[in-house]
Each structure stands twice: as structure tokens, then as C-alpha cells.
């Protein structure tokens, strides 16, 4: 009975998250006996409703590396606040030498981003955003920088409570009262 419930839970979890392989890279370790080949995979999982995760997997075979990357991505899933179809405010994500600027955009703008950042943002559920990558463009670091930036997002309600103003003032700027 417990096995059936566990299987159903696993099916629901796998159906809930969409998986995307961003990069498969062949790496080589040079040894006395020659080169030892292995593969590194960067995967992103998300439900397009505010949950997203990034993972890296390494193995001698591609399918095993993919499995490990997806497992790592599922383990790193974080929830982010969304405001309509965009992010609530501008945010800057960093990972090592990679930096990513994420800006909210008007409806109809779409996702203005490179392939790595686009994968993370799309699977998070953001439909309109402007991004700019600064520094290193290594795909793993860009994906992690984007995730770090998304982690730093604060919902308008929470920001308003912290700053003791209304959520509208957070989103549209403070207006002078006559």
C-alpha cells in the first residue's frame, strides 16, 4: 500500500515539474593511460508557477549525467514571488564572476534573455522580463546567478510591510500626497 502511494507521489511530482537540459558538455581528464572522458549536464526544472531549480550532474555516460542533473535541480527548487506575468522588482544575481540583471517588463515584452537565463526564467513562470548578463558567461554560473537573483525577490506585500508603505507605492513608486 505504501509503495503505491509513493509511486503516485513520484508521478505527481514528475508531472508537476517541466525539465529542460540547458547544456551537455564533454570533459576530459588526461591520465598516464590516456584521456578519461566524462560528461557534465546542466538541467533546469520548474512548474511555470513560481518554482524553479538548477542542477549539475557529472558522469561517464550522458543519460546518467542527465539523471543526476535533474535530481540535483529538483533538490534545489526554490519558490519565487511573481507579479502578474513579470517579477515584482529589479534584482541583481551573482555567482562567481557571472552577474545577471533582471528587470520587470510590461505585458507583451516577452523574455529578453540569452538561452541559459531564458531557460531558468521561463520555467519559473515569468513571461515578461528584461535581462542583462555581465561578467562571465559560463552557462552554469549564469544559471546559478539567475537563480540567486530570483531568490532575492520579495513580494510587493512583504516589501510594503517592511517599509511601512502600501503595496501600490512599492510597485509604482511613492507619490506625494497633497
Swiss-Prot record:
InterPro entries: Ribosomal_Su5_D2-typ_SF, Ribosomal_uS5, Ribosomal_uS5_bac-type, Ribosomal_uS5_C, Ribosomal_uS5_N, Ribosomal_uS5_N_CS, Ribsml_uS5_D2-typ_fold_subgr. GO terms for cellular component: small ribosomal subunit. Keywords: Ribonucleoprotein, Ribosomal protein, RNA-binding, rRNA-binding. Residues 17-80 form the S5 DRBM domain. Belongs to the universal ribosomal protein uS5 family. The N-terminal domain interacts with the head of the 30S subunit; the C-terminal domain interacts with the body and contacts protein S4. The interaction surface between S4 and S5 is involved in control of translational fidelity. Part of the 30S ribosomal subunit. Contacts proteins S4 and S8. This is Small ribosomal subunit protein uS5.
Amino acid at each position: 500500500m505504501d509503495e503505491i502511494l509513493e509511486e503516485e507521489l513520484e508521478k505527481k511530482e514528475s508531472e508537476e515539474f517541466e525539465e529542460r537540459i540547458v547544456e551537455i558538455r564533454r570533459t576530459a581528464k588526461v591520465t598516464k593511460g590516456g584521456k578519461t572522458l566524462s560528461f557534465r549536464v546542466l538541467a533546469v526544472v520548474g512548474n511555470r508557477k513560481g518554482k524553479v531549480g538548477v542542477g549539475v550532474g557529472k558522469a561517464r555516460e550522458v543519460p546518467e549525467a542527465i539523471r543526476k542533473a535533474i535530481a540535483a535541480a529538483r533538490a534545489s527548487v526554490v519558490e519565487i514571488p511573481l507579479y502578474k506575468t513579470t517579477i515584482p522588482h529589479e534584482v541583481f544575481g551573482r555567482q562567481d564572476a557571472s552577474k545577471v540583471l533582471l528587470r520587470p517588463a510590461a505585458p507583451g515584452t516577452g523574455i529578453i534573455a540569452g538561452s541559459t537565463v531564458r531557460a531558468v526564467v521561463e520555467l519559473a513562470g515569468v513571461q515578461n522580463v528584461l535581462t542583462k548578463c555581465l561578467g562571465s558567461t559560463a552557462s552554469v554560473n549564469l544559471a546559478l546567478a539567475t537563480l540567486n537573483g530570483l531568490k532575492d525577490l520579495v513580494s510587493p506585500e512583504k516589501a510594503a510591510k517592511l517599509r511601512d508603505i502600501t503595496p501600490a507605492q512599492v510597485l509604482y513608486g511613492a507619490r506625494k500626497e497633497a
